[in-house]
Amino acid sequence: MKDRISFSSDYTKGAHPLILQRLQETNFEQITGYGTDDYCKSAADKIKKSCNAKDADVFFLVGGTQTNQTVIDMLLEPYEGVVAAQTGHVAAHEAGAIEFSGHKVLTLPSFNEEPQFTDKEKPCYSDQVGKIKGADLKKLIDDFYADDNHEHMVFPGAVYISHPTEYGTLYSKAELEEISGICKEYKIPLFLDGARLGYGLMSKRTDVTIEDIARLVDVFYVGGTKVGALFGEAVVFTKGVPVKHPVPVIKQHGALLAKGWLLGLQFDTLFTDDLYMKISKNAIEMAEILRNKLVERGYQIYIDSPTNQQFVVMEDDKLKELSEHVSYGFWEKLDDTNTVVRFATDWATTVEDIDTLFKYL
């Protein structure tokens, strides 16, 4: 609705103006399809340069769930499943897309840790972080192979993590190195979901770079849908493509766009003059302002998120009033009278947007 402001997610707006400009400029060009065009090649080259992985293979897919399903299916044998946090997107919010492709999601509990953000009056309500721990991953694999009946069970064939996580939290470089080392030890590929990758990379509290990710994982993707593109995700296989013919597999999963240059052109724009990182930084700066204002108003921060997703505990009566003017994301019911909600900033959020939000908070 036009008279409501939205902080419900980071994909409620169209695309960065420079992308729209380039789409307009090239609108009447006649371009080859399915990602075989020069725009896709240029975008792939820029992405490979940004992560210092000149031998990587890059493919442009249409959306996040299609990407997760396609990549995981590429990585696994028919008798294998993918290990993920029980809070992971593939385990909780993809309508069984992984299972629909014939693979089980083998869940691990996400662990808790002491929040870095603290407020003496109201510290973070939860210490949930939505990440998997290396030790838990190793135990799952060891326990599987220690079971005499493991030939009759779903094999752990790949590991899925996201950065940022569903809770907006981040893996440290040490955590990624530990998980990567375990995956290498057991010859299991590591897949990093980067739907919000830009927001993770530009967080003020990260020591992880895109070069680190390319070095430590077997495949990751650069999210466009939530970070300035109209749609699309750029999949980067850093250590070789796991199937002989990837394009037909991508097509089988409904993730191959006939007008593939529309994806390539967008990512070529995002990876020109560091635009992807610049607009991601805006979301982080706006989230910091939002969080500080929430604390000043006395609201209870729920999770210590250093990225663009901010989670807050609100009274249900207040939410009824707020919902008339603001779209927010429902997260979970905390108790009979309180709810956890998510406010998400994005690449285009302004200070004026936040000021408008706080007229109703």
Q: Can you annotate each of these PLM segments?
A:
Residues 78-79, 288-361:
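Conserved C-terminal alpha-helix-loop-beta "cap" of PLP-dependent enzymes
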Residues 171-203:
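Catalytic PLP-binding core of fold-type I/II PLP enzymes
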Residues 74-92, 116-125:
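Conserved PLP-anchoring active-site segment centered on the Schiff-base-forming lysine
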Residues 82-104, 111-112:
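Substrate-binding/gating loop at the entrance of the active-site cleft, primarily
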Residues 16-64, 85-91, 97:
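Conserved N-terminal alpha-helix of the aminotransferase class I/II PLP-enzyme fold
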Residues 111, 155-157, 170, 203, ...:
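Active-site C-terminal subdomain of aminotransferase-like
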Residues 102-157, 161-164, 171-175:
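PLP-dependent aminotransferase-class I/II
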